[in-house]
Swiss-Prot record:
This is BPI fold-containing family A member 3. It is found in: Secreted. Residues 1-22 form the signal peptide. Keywords: Disulfide bond, Glycoprotein, Secreted, Signal. One of its GO terms (molecular function) is lipid binding. Its main location: secreted. It comes from the Eukaryota. The gene is Bpifa3. Belongs to the BPI/LBP/Plunc superfamily. Plunc family. Disulfide bonds join C165-C209.
Amino acid sequence: MHLLWRLLVLLLGLLALPSALPKQPWPGLTKAHKDGRSTLARIIAQGLLKLNAEGRIQSMRLLDRLNVSGTVAPGMVGWLIGGMNFQQQQEISINITNVQLDCGGIQMAFPKEWFSANITLEFDIEFKLPFNSNIIKTHACMGLTAESWLEKDEFGRRELVMGRCRMEPSSGGASMSTEETSPKMKHFLHNLRESLGKVIPNLVESQVCPLIGEILRQLDVKLLKGLVGACS
């Protein structure tokens, strides 16, 4: 009788066991979902840092690009340097400083194994003009999207395909803000900002997009598949 009672207690304990388990078995999957995205974003961010993406952007020669025909407001550069001697022309400078670049997140789509890296970029632009003793500063905030996916070849092997890599339509000059300047400079700076808004996105794309492709191609396809699959 004592043995039968012990078996009955054990049976009741086993029947009660499922109720003690978590009702939702997804916490682990949720963690993997977050980890897959964050790991890939971290790999891209660290890769951009290692490949000196910020330094490349900071060294872009904006003034040279503005002097290329068709990239500036009509007559702007001519108006700027037309009444200057050679020494004054040499004093003109447009420099990028305080570059901050990061991978802000990863978007994914299934079952196509497609993912998109969202790159955030901020920097200051400093203007030094011979007829103005102060350094004029503007601030730019931009976003760049780089698309990629894994595609099977005729033998069923996956390979990385790089898609579009471009600045977001709302990026560029639209997000620039200028510090207070004299009325004499406002019209010139307005035209200059518009011109930079046309020039900078292409320059940034030419510097950052090849680096993202280089970073992703260095990853083992199985590792990349695992990161993407962790979020499915």
